[in-house]
C-alpha cells in the first residue's frame, strides 16, 4: 500500500515535536508499504487545505497522522475524532477556536477505519508501551483526524485513515521529573510496528478498552 505519514511542527513555545522527528526517521519501505512523509503546520486554518491538495495530487491508500501528546506514557493509536475545535492554547497562527464545529455538514464523530487494536497490539508485541486511546483531544490533532474522516466520508470512500499520538522525548522533559517521555528510537520502532499491522484486513477482537 501507498501510505502518507504526517507529523506536526513544534508548537506551544517548543522547538521540537517528536511526531515529526519520528516520521522523518521511518524507513521509506515498511513491510509491503511505500511511505511518503509530510510535515503539517500546527494550524487549524492551514492543515485542511494542505491535506486536500496533497490527496488531490497523489493517490494514497492510507493516511496516518502522528501527533504529540505530552503527558502520555505510551504510543496511542486513536479510535475516534469528534466534530469540535476547543483549543486550550492558541495554535501557531495565534488562533484559538472555542466550541467550533470542524465541518457543519460532518458527522458528530468519525471512527478510524484502520485496525487500531491490531496496531496497538503490534506496538505492545515489540515490548513497547502501547495503548488504544478513545480521545484525540480537541486541538489540531483531533481536527486532522476528523478532517480525514470527513474526506473519506464525502470524497474518498476507499481511503483508510488514522492517527497515533506519541509521548514527549527525553529532551522535552528536562527539569520536569514527573512528566513521562520515551526515547525517539522507541517511538520510531513503535510507529513501524503499527504501520506493519495496517496490512490486517480485519481488526483484532481483544479487550483494549478502559473503564473510565
Curated annotation (Swiss-Prot):
Compartments where found: Cytoplasm
Catalytic activity: Release of an N-terminal pyroglutamyl group from a polypeptide, the second amino acid generally not being Pro
Species whose genome carries this gene: Staphylococcus aureus (strain JH9)
tRNA processing is among the record's keywords: no
Lineage: Bacteria, Bacillati, Bacillota, Bacilli, Bacillales
Subunit structure: Homotetramer.
Primary site of residence: cytoplasm
Keyword Oxidoreductase: no
Endpoints of the signal sequence: none
Molecular function GO terms recorded: pyroglutamyl-peptidase activity
One Gene Ontology CC term in the entry: cytosol
EC numbers, comma separated: 3.4.19.3
Alphabetic keyword roster: Cytoplasm, Hydrolase, Protease, Thiol protease
Gene3D superfamilies in alphabetical order: Peptidase C15, pyroglutamyl peptidase I-like
Family designation: Belongs to the peptidase C15 family.
Catalytic machinery residues: 78, 141, 165
Entry's Gene Ontology BP terms: proteolysis
A Pfam family this chain is assigned to: Peptidase_C15
InterPro entries referenced in this protein's UniProt entry, alphabetically: Peptidase_C15, Peptidase_C15-like, Peptidase_C15-like_sf, PGP-I_bact-type, PGPEP1_Cys_AS, PGPEP1_Glu_AS
Enzyme class of the recorded protein, top EC level: hydrolase
Gene assigned in the entry: pcp
Coiled coil: none
Protein name per Swiss-Prot or TrEMBL: Pyrrolidone-carboxylate peptidase
Role according to the record: Removes 5-oxoproline from various penultimate amino acid residues except L-proline.
Amino acid at each position: 500500500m501507498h501510505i502518507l505519514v504526517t507529523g506536526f511542527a513544534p508548537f506551544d513555545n517548543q522547538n521540537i515535536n517528536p511526531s515529526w522527528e519520528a516520521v522523518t526517521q521511518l524507513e521509506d519501505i515498511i513491510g509491503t508499504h511505500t511511505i511518503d512523509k509530510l510535515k503539517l503546520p500546527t494550524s487549524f486554518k492551514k492543515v485542511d487545505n494542505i491535506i486536500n491538495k496533497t490527496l488531490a495530487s497523489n493517490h494514497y491508500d492510507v493516511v496516518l497522522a502522528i501527533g504529540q501528546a505530552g503527558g502520555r506514557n505510551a504510543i496511542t493509536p486513536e479510535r475516534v475524532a469528534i466534530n469540535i475545535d476547543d483549543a486550550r492554547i492558541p495554535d501557531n497562527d495565534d488562533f484559538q477556536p472555542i466550541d467550533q464545529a470542524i465541518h457543519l455538514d460532518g458527522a458528530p464523530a468519525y471512527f478510524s477505519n484502520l485496525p487500531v487494536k491490531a496496531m496497538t497490539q503490534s506496538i505492545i508485541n515489540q515490548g513497547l508501551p502501547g495503548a488504544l486511546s478513545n480521545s484525540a483531544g480537541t486541538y489540531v490533532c483531533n481536527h486532522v483526524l476528523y478532517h480525514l474522516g470527513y474526506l473519506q466520508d464525502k470524497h474518498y470512500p476507499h481511503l483508510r485513515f488514522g492517527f497515533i499520538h506519541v509521548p514527549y522525548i527525553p529532551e522535552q522533559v528536562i527539569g520536569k521529573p514527573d512528566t513521562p517521555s520515551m526515547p525517539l528510537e522507541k517511538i520510531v520502532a513503535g510507529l513501524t510496528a503499527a504501520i506493519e499491522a495496517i496490512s490486517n484486513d480485519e481488526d483484532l477482537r481483544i479487550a483494549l478498552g478502559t473503564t473510565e
